Amino acid sequence: MTLSSSQSSPPSSQNLKRKQQTISSFFTKRAPTAEKRSNDLEDGRATTQKGAEMPLRETTGDQDDLVDDEDGDIVVRAPKRVKTNRVDPENGFGRNVTRGPDPPSSSSQRTNLCKFASSPADDAGIEKADDPEARQRQLEREKLHKLFVKKLGGADCLIGIGRNATTEAPSGTEEVAEGDEDDESAPPPRSKGKGASKKGGSKLTPLEKQVIEIKRKHMDTVLVIEVGYKFRFFGEDARIAAKELSIVCIPGKMRFDEHPSEAHLDRFASASIPVHRLHVHVKRLVSAGYKVGVVRQLETAALKAVGDNRNAPFSRKLTNLYTKGTYVDDVEGLDGATPAASGGASPATGYMLCITETNAKGWGNDEKVHVGIVAVQPNTGDIIYDDFEDGFMRSEVEARLLHIAPCELVIVGELSKATEKLVQHLSGSKLNTFGDKVRVDRVAKKKTAVAESHSHVANFYAAKLKAANTADDAPASNLLQKVLNLPEQVTVCLSAMIEHLTEYGLEHIFELTKYFQHFSSRSHMLLNANTLVSLEIYQNQTDHSAKGSLFWTLDRTQTRFGQRLLRKWVGRPLLDKERLEERVNAVEELKSPDRTVQVERLKILLGRIKSDLEKNLIRIYYGKCTRPELLTVLQTLQTIAQEYVDVKTPEDSGFTSPILGEAIARVPSILEDVVKFLNKINMHAARNDDKYEFFRESEETEGISEHKCGIASVEHELEEHRSVAAGILKWPKVTYVTSSGIEYLIEVENTAAAIKRVPASWVKVSGTKKLSRFHTPEVIQLLRQRDQHKEALAAACDQAFAALLAEIATNYQSFRDSVQSLATLDCLLSLAAIASQPGYVKPEYTDQTCIHVEQGRHPMVEQLLLDSYVPNDIDLDSDRTRALLVTGPNMGGKSSYVRQIALIAIMAQIGSYVPARSAKLGMLDAVFTRMGAFDNMLAGESTFMVELSETADILKQATPRSLVILDELGRGTSTHDGVAIAQAVLDYMVRTIRSLTLFITHYQHLSNMAQSFPNHELRNVHMRFTESGSGKDEEITFLYEVGEGVAHRSYGLNVARLANLPAPLLEVARQKSSELEERIRRRRLAGLRADVGGLMEDPAKGDEDFFQRLISNAEQL
């Protein structure tokens, strides 16, 4: 073959001729003669004739060439690129070559150089074809040509490059092929004259115009767009999807603003996912922190074909929006429901928290801010609100964020710098729900925000009450009044959350005003942020997982909703003595051997609940429940209610505890409603998610019945048509067949006699070598009618199902109350399982502020240790000893001892048994801790600054009914300053605040303070140990027992030895320590000698304080 032009004569310029010669010399060893070119021409013509005899290969998946005509039939547009089978003249096998439309009359120089034909002018002087040398040279040229074509990727690839503005690129063809039959596109662009090309590439398809229109309204959203049987991403969304979902992104334009940098690109970048995997991928995108929108087609192909807009693209609309907090379309949610008992992460709360604040007063360390919060859990329907003042440390805000653990934040207005830094720190830390960055949305706050918010909330609830016809109902009016009386900052947050959730279609949750809860209710013990972390309430401090936390220790629940309720109990211990006694008495009854039968019955019942009923019910309330899920929920509720159908009153439950009796009696009250709904459902169809047979025949709506009759009528006509078809073919009878999913086909043998009888109007659908399959025009028309009825039936079934969900939603509160009763029973059974362990005792409650525990143990360490835990006593009373100064060697167990005391107090006020021989406790209103050393670089605060700031916060909030734990206060500065601060704080705690206090220190000088309290309000205790050996052979044995008195040494060198510091270093440290101790001993001895000498000179100095100081100095020697 020879490279020349077949469409136009070669240019006459000498430069172009040189270029042609240069390229020809690249492909051939020497220039061919005219005779050889003639041989090439004949071979080329032969090849072309062979190729023309080959059938065209059909393109698959390219639906851009299909459009709907006015009758709804599919017609074919002009092809963009057609693949043909060409036969290689050398080896005889076909190869795929992409052929474009006929090129324009004028071609570029580069294009002309790469076309394969001959010019009539070259016919003269042709060499004979049988010349062996010519034939050899021809084979070599063709071999080089094949290598060249293989390198470029196609025989006419340079033609495509030369006509980039008028010809679809191969990647574009692949992209369209990846789509489905509903991927509407514009006709292939025609050849454009000079200046006719549009900036930004080829003309946008109708689908792309639709995508841009929707995207411009939702620029902050990753859009997943339904296109036929796939969901597709476009532009920047495709890049994000490819990154997060590990799918292929077809290159193209990323931006939606026709940016000049992308003018050379013809199409948007795209990626696709199958329809049935939509929610799997949406969950992954939402979990990664993205806001995801699902755009669906609002019409089907069959209904569109008979509609007024059959020639327009499919109508599409944004139907769903999802973020972390609003994803309720899957009952599993985003947390994967890893049980905490297995040592996984703490269960996700799924709260969305709205926060706003105003500057109340002060500046710097005296700054006070007024904060309002509203936290909503769309998965369960819970709503928490609070209004409070907070200091410059923002400890109150931090405590609420750690308690609620939101997965999404909505910030109204501007936050102060301190609050903003705290939010940023916690939202990016592992302390949040999902262990990754929390999504943050911001809402502007107007100057008239309070008035506008109050009006918005009032109108919202007034409209809801009017729609429910309960405006004159006294309970409904009281609930409305309760909402309207919320504090101003809470109302601002509530209004913002209503508006925010309206965008996601979840505003109905605020109609459930029964589930509004105040966070700071004084009916619960206050556990601030430091306490939650230091005492490891929800997460351990090692790897931040649930294993090793108090919640992990107490969690023996069998249901998801029971686990969530127990988490609330753990974080909010009770202050009401009567409620506590009721709860702990219920636990005692459940562990009693006399109630074994009833308890086993309860355990079996709860063990049969496999679904998360609380989340299922809220999904029904939102109208997002699936048919199999609805059947499971109703059958589970029926099973639960029937288990206790004979229980009419709490006394019939078999338990004497009021909590247990009332919870069990509430369960069967829903049985009548559940059975009523189940009687409407066809169980088998619901289990198989068959929407068409979901309702029993007597419960079907008029629309469903009408379209079912229409389908039956069409199918009857199809059967009647068999006789007509048999008469045309002159057969006794005709039998329909189904092939590849296509129904009502008539098979005719491929014989001349049989085919002759087939009318020309019959459409051949498929066939084999022996037979052909046809559709008659009547069958095509009837099938089209049947498809229309089927799609209308599907819409009617969906509408009826939505109406059923709305009817069930009217019973939401009664169903939810029954599920809450089950959750309470589950939590009590969990606490009973803990109480049944050896060494646990029922706590005794008193109105006094005291902690009297005999042989108490650390609840978590005891379960994690292989060896037995050493128990210890504690005796604190506000009227006697209310503070302990704890000293002892490093690693002696001081911190574990004080944590143990706090944890026992918290467990007791949860209503749990405690690990001790006996326990008598008063009602503590809070537990405050100041433990550990860390700085706050975000706020520019040093370790010592953080330490003192937290201490100041405790001094402001602590009451005589609080338990305060201070660990090594004052160690972040010099010894003299540290001792002074520690002594002043301890004295203030004991004398002024009068809290129960546990003070850990290595400052032995503080032990002298106990002598200034004659009634033993402060007492010295230490962690016991034994010494053996001396010098470098000295060894310390920790006994982990609490003894009276003071430990005068901390034995830090022993810890250094256990840490495997180098022996030479330890020897130097021991020598320096001995020298320092000797120097201090001599100073004290000199001071003691001086005091004794002064006393002998002037006996009048010997008052009581003098002799106490003298005795203390002598003891320290």
Curated annotation (Swiss-Prot):
Positions with biased composition (Low complexity): 1-14
Main location as per UniProt: nucleus
Annotated segments matching region Mispair-binding domain: 198-325
Role of this protein: Component of the post-replicative DNA mismatch repair system (MMR). Heterodimerizes with msh2 to form MutS beta, which binds to DNA mismatches thereby initiating DNA repair. Msh3 provides substrate-binding and substrate specificity to the complex. When bound, the MutS beta heterodimer bends the DNA helix and shields approximately 20 base pairs. Acts mainly to repair insertion-deletion loops (IDLs) from 2 to 13 nucleotides in size, but can also repair base-base and single insertion-deletion mismatches that occur during replication.
Protein's name in the database: DNA mismatch repair protein msh3
Biased segments, Acidic residues type: 61-73, 175-185
Family membership: Belongs to the DNA mismatch repair MutS family. MSH3 subfamily.
Gene Ontology cellular component annotations, sorted alphabetically: nucleus
Assembly and binders: Heterodimer consisting of msh2-msh3 (MutS beta). Forms a ternary complex with MutL alpha (mlh1-pms1).
A Gene Ontology biological process term: mitotic recombination
UniProt region (Disordered), positions on chain: 1-135, 165-203
Amino acids binding ATP: G888, P889, N890, M891, G892, G893, K894, S895
Compartments it resides in: Nucleus
Signal peptide: none
Keywords: ATP-binding, DNA damage, DNA repair, DNA-binding, Nucleotide-binding, Nucleus
Comp. bias (Basic and acidic residues): 32-45, 125-135
Chain intervals with Basic residues compositional bias: 191-201
Organism: Neosartorya fischeri (strain ATCC 1020 / DSM 3700 / CBS 544.65 / FGSC A1164 / JCM 1740 / NRRL 181 / WB 181)
Name of one Pfam family that matches: MutS_V
Record GO terms (molecular function): ATP binding; ATP-dependent DNA damage sensor activity; mismatched DNA binding
